[in-house]
């Protein structure tokens, strides 16, 4: 998996691509999110439009990020999930926990 990030105001924007398939893969993403929270960033947009595959460990990474932000009064938004990832979100009922958005403008 490859990711990059940017902070826009009080929002962390993470762009993930490839496969999110484990704690090792997601550890740097978690570290980036934790650092942003320490810097008083309250919102996180995770652009998953280029994410091809996600397994249970990858879902755990997303849930950990969500928990960290919500514990500080913030929130996490998943942006533009692919059809296969969207199906997974529905099957796992995570679409009811995460807010799904189509553009950064819905949050920024």
Regions found by a protein language model. Give the residues of each.
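Acidic phosphotransfer microenvironment of two-component signaling modules
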Residues: 83, 105-106
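STAS-typified acidic loop motif
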Residues: 3-31
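Amphipathic alpha-helical interaction surfaces in cytosolic regulatory modules
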Residues: 20-98
């Amino acid at each position: 998996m490859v990711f990059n990030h940017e902070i826009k105001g009080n929002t962390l924007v993470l762009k993930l691509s490839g496969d999110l398939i484990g704690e090792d893969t997601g550890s740097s993403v978690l570290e980036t999110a934790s650092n942003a929270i320490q810097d008083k960033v309250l919102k996180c947009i995770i652009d998953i439009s280029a994410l091809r595959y996600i397994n249970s460990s990858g879902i755990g990474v997303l849930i950990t990020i969500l928990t960290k932000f919500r514990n500080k009064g913030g929130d996490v938004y998943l942006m533009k999930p692919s059809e296969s990832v969207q199906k997974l979100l529905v099957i796992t009922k995570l679409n009811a926990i995460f807010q799904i958005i189509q553009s950064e403008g819905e949050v920024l």
